Each structure stands twice: as structure tokens, then as C-alpha cells.
């Protein structure tokens, strides 16, 4: 008879969890940041709020965002005027929209990732789906399983309402699933649509206005598994370790509340300061076991909560400007897509490394770090190992 220990040993993979494919998708509707203040104040019937509009213009100018993608078109907003008010009852309209669109956008990214992976989707054993947009039972994980035609026995995990740190969370979960289930192939999907947070401007809630200037829609998908099949599955990054922590003295720094008016956000001004003040502790805990203390020797993938966070982290750690290039590029081209952002940055980094003829997927370097920042204030830290190109 087999012992429990023997059975458990046979269940475990031998090598580290590995990202084997990445796919991304956005809605078709592209919004230029330079034109957005005029559009936003017009569509929300707020053009009389001239001082507030000037403030919003300055926010958009400082955002370092060039364009974003949004499911909400002018036509949709005209059909749903309560979405354009500051706090009108609108949850039903928002939910009805996103419970359909979030899995659909997730399917686009997942289809690309599965195609790059090159294996039949019947080999997918687990699905991790993450969104801050829309809640139903059965959830977006079930809807995506149906849309993709995955096996009914796929083991699903649905993550709702995590916020911007969750791109790190899904990697942590996928790593544990892949390494503790021999032969597992985990489809990870983050799909975010801002229809839950869109609302008109108000003088008393400027942090909501910050969100209107930063957030965009997008979905990203990965295939994660251990022990890639040689010549068949092509590793992109290895997931070496993953940690999560709540920053000290950060209660209420980032809050989100899903109510009748939709999802409202509250941000304290000191969010960039809280993150930059505590980030070195997370780095030390993650990299001390590897004997690494030079943060410029790493490749960097940081959730781009906004330019102020990136600037303060860069300054605090004396990072070279090029360290956050991929992060700033994704912020510029897509805005803040919450949980999907860091997965877009992984894709951008490996793409640029191939384009520039570098010898690893991590900008020619061996080790890297991925950070997720979000409500809590919660920080996810993932240690990455690059792969030779």
C-alpha cells in the first residue's frame, strides 16, 4: 500500500512554476488622454464646472498616459445616463454590462495565450480568474470555461474585488497550484472593465476624479506550469518566490466600496509615500536568500498605480531611469488596468527583449521583481527568474 508521503511526493512537480505564454486584449474603443477632459465633462453634463475641469486637465496632463481603452462608448453612456451622474443608483446597469463583457474580454486574451502555448486546451487543468468588475454566481470563471470550451472538470478559482495588487496574487496562486500538482497547466486571466467605477465629477470627491484620469480597460492571460515539455513548451519567466504583506500605518490608504452607485474609490494623498517608504523591506525579505542587494541588478515589473508612485520608488531606491521603462510604457499606452497591468508589463518586457536582441527575457539580466500595490495597503512581491532567449 502507498503511504501518504509517497502519494504526496508523486503529486509534486520537480521544477519551479514557469510562465509559458502571455496574451493580452483591450476593447476596441481607444481614448486619447489629451482629448479626454473635454469628452468627460461633456458626456457627464459637467461643462459648467470650469474650475474642476481645469483640475482634471492638470491631472490628465501629469498622468504620463497617452491613451487608454474603454468599453464605455459615448453611445453606451447616452443609453445609461445614471452612469454619468456623480452618485445615481446605477449598480444594476453596471453589473448587467460587466458580467457579460468581463468574461468576453478575458476570452480574447486567453485565446491568444493558448495559441502561443501551442497545446490543446484540454490540457488546461486549472483556471484562476480575477476581476474587480462585476459579481455573479456562477462567476466569470464559469462563463469563461463555457466560452473557451474548457473541460467541465477544470479546477476553477474566482477572485473578486482584490484591486490593483491582484496581478501579483494570481501569480502567487498559480505558482502554488503548478508546483504542488504534477503536470498542472494553469490558465490565469485578469479582466478589468471600468464601467463599475465611471461617474461624473464632484468637487468633494477629488480622489474619484484621480481614478477617472488613470483607469483603463484590459485583460491579460498566462499559461503557468512546472517542468515544461522540451521542444514543445517554451518558458518565458520562472516564478521563484511570492509574498504578500500589509504595509504598517496604511489603514484607509486605498479603499473601494461597491454600493448602489457602483464602485467608489478613496485614496489618501500619502499612498506613494507609504509604498516608497516600505518597498526596500519587501525587497530585502525577497532577495536576501539569493544574496542580492543591488536593486539595479534586477529587471523591474511594478504595478503603475500612477506616475507619483513610480517616481518616488525610483527616487527612494536610486533606480536607473531605464529600470521602469516597461512599466512606464504600459502606463502610457493603456493607463492603469488594475490587476491586468503587471501581466501586460511582462508581455511588453519579453517582446522588447526579443526586438532588441537581448540574451534573456529579463532585459539581459537573470533576476527580477514584480510588485503589485493595492487596497489594504497591500503589496505583493514576486521574485522572477528570466529565461535565455
Curated annotation (Swiss-Prot):
Query: Top enzyme class of this protein?
Result: transferase
Q: In this UniProt entry, which cysteines form S-S bonds? A: none
Which molecular function GO terms apply here?
Answer: naringenin-chalcone synthase activity
One GO cellular component from the entry? polyketide synthase complex
Q: Which residues form the active site?
A: 164
Q: Which family does it belong to?
A: Belongs to the thiolase-like superfamily. Chalcone/stilbene synthases family.
Matching entries from PANTHER family are given as: CHALCONE SYNTHASE 1, HYDROXYMETHYLGLUTARYL-COA SYNTHASE
Provide the protein name. Naringenin-chalcone synthase
Q: Which gene encodes it?
A: CHS
